[in-house]
From Swiss-Prot:
Disulfide bridge partners, by residue number: none
Encoding gene per record: mqo
Key words, A-Z: FAD, Flavoprotein, Oxidoreductase, Tricarboxylic acid cycle
Upper lineage: Bacteria, Pseudomonadati, Pseudomonadota, Betaproteobacteria, Nitrosomonadales
Protein's UniProt name: Probable malate:quinone oxidoreductase
Assigned EC number: 1.1.5.4
Length: 492
């Protein structure tokens, strides 16, 4: 027998995006009936899980791929500014949630971890110096430090400097109030709070099998624990299911989804098992990506706090896969090819063969080869103290392109229906770090009339003090907001 339920808001996927949107909507209108559907037995088991993502509070401080050097030698910083301002919005919301007791102690999900970029060789040192000069001239990056002094770098990153050839020039930048974020813990806390509110339902072990718009959205699902069909009628649907989002978006048949495809990329970490080594490193040290590597593969020696315990990771090592989820099917990629996106998929595949070859090469790397990559960052690394652990899946966006048929894009994108009744988040990187501004975009697209009301405007400014203003343009606002969030989240 089919069970049925009615809901105002249906969130598909129990990750950080759905948890953030559900929390925002509940704070804006506590009367809304909100239902969250998750395939697994618990929320935050895929890309939001601590072991499945970089955990970096992506603020553009250390990620060199956000500021690639132009042919003329200049270093454009516009993308880094945008990402930094976006992360500041996330920090503001989290700080407010801590103040209200919705999130527990900040250390339960976010911890101060300096963000550093590290390079070696004359050419790379010159690039990092230019990058620092360009960024530090802007108020968002005014606190960024730079040094070529090995003694200073020894203090910032002792593991990185120990045993290094002193004849090779090195340089590093550092922002002391960078952060490590356990998005799994953050997601679970947000969902736990929603579970205590009237009108919220969490349906785990439920698989969405179809959705069709007939006035409201008619969503078909299966309760996997009982093998029973479920029908859900929803006024608004958000697809935030990570790699499963694209197939669900295709099932929706909205016009705006035409032409979109996905390119799955897997990830792996080298994880240290020696507590003495782990406690000697306290930073996220990012380097330059190898030639041909996708941006989510920028190598870094990474301090993490996962489920309250310190960890030390190096990677990620990307790889080629046909799965869209870590626990997905090998047929995911093939099944995603439709008549509406065939041209896009073929065009992107034809023009990105170098990336495919790179990813396949990464898959067949030996442990010794991965250790050699690690020793660029930790010269004295002992092979016996590190092992390989699988990370999460990323499905990069493929879009229609007039000149190439299709193009591969690295980033995130909101796709929404013309009537605002459905929205989906595609892509990855910077991903979870910008969950708040990403979900604000969903509100702007799909709840525009309500968002313009005096009540919602007032509530938004309470939750995000910089709402409606530009942190990129307003230095005084940035200083005030940053002082408050860093203090409230105990990042300084």
């Amino acid at each position: 027998m089919t069970s049925s339920l009615d809901t105002d808001i249906l969130l598909v996927g129990g990750g950080i995006m759905s948890a953030t949107l559900g929390t925002l909507l509940h704070q804006l209108n506590p009367e809304l009936r909100i239902t969250l559907v998750e395939l697994q037995a618990e929320v935050a088991t895929e890309s939001s899980d601590g072991w499945n993502n970089a955990g970096t509070g992506h603020a553009g401080y250390c990620e060199l791929n956000y500021t690639p050097q132009d042919a003329d030698g200049s270093v454009p910083i516009a993308r880094a500014l945008k990402i930094n301002a976006a992360f500041e919005e996330s920090l503001q919301f989290w700080a407010w949630l801590v103040e209200k007791g919705i999130l527990r102690e900040p250390a339960s999900f976010i911890n101060p971890t300096p963000h550093s970029s590290f390079v070696w060789g004359e050419k790379n040192v010159a690039f990092l110096r230019k990058r620092h000069q360009a960024l530090r001239a802007h108020h968002l990056f005014a606190d960024m430090e730079y040094s070529q002094d090995p003694a200073v770098l020894q203090q910032w990153m002792p593991l990185v400097m120990a045993g290094r050839d002193p004849s090779i020039p090195v340089a590093a930048t550092r922002v002391a109030y960078g952060s490590d974020v356990d998005f799994g813990s953050l997601t679970r806390q947000l969902v736990q709070h929603l579970q205590g509110r009237p009108g919220f339902k969490l349906l785990t072990r439920h698989a969405v099998t179809g959705l069709k718009q007939q006035g409201s959205w008619q969503v078909k699902a299966v309760d996997l624990s009982q093998g029973k069909p479920v029908e859900i009628r929803a006024g608004f649907v958000f697809l935030g299911a990570g790699g499963a989002t694209l197939p669900l978006l295709q099932k929706s048949a909205i016009q705006e989804a035409r032409g979109y495809g996905g390119f799955p990329v897997s990830g792996q970490w080298l994880v240290c098992h020696n507590p003495d080594v782990i406690h000697q490193h306290h930073a996220k040290v990012y380097g330059k990506a190898p030639l041909g590597a996708p941006p989510m593969s920028v190598p870094h020696l990474d301090t993490r706090i996962i489920n309250g315990k310190p960890a030390l990771l190096f990677g990620p090592f990307a790889g080629f896969t046909t799965r869209f989820l870590k626990r997905g099917s090998l047929l995911d990629l093939v099944n995603s090819v439709k008549r509406s996106n065939l041209k896009s998929m073929l065009g992107a595949g034809r023009h990105h063969m170098d990336l495919t070859r790179y990813l396949i090469g990464e898959v067949f790397q030996s442990h010794q080869q991965r250790m050699a990559a690690l020793r660029n960052f930790y010269p004295l690394a002992n092979e016996s103290e590190w092992s390989l652990v699988s990370a999460g899946q990323r499905v990069q966006i493929i879009k229609q392109c007039e000149h190439q048929g299709g193009k591969l894009e690295f980033g995130t994108e909101i796709v929404s229906s013309a009537d605002g009744s459905l929205a989906a988040l595609l892509g990855a990187s910077p991903g979870a770090s910008t969950s708040v501004p990403a979900m604000l975009e969903v509100l702007q697209r799909c709840f525009s009339p309500q968002l313009q009301s005096a009540a919602w405007q007032e509530r938004m400014r309470e939750m995000l003090p910089s709402y409606g203003q530009s942190l990129i343009e307003d230095a005084e606002l940035l200083r005030a907001v940053r002082y408050h969030t860093l203090s409230r989240l105990k990042l300084t």
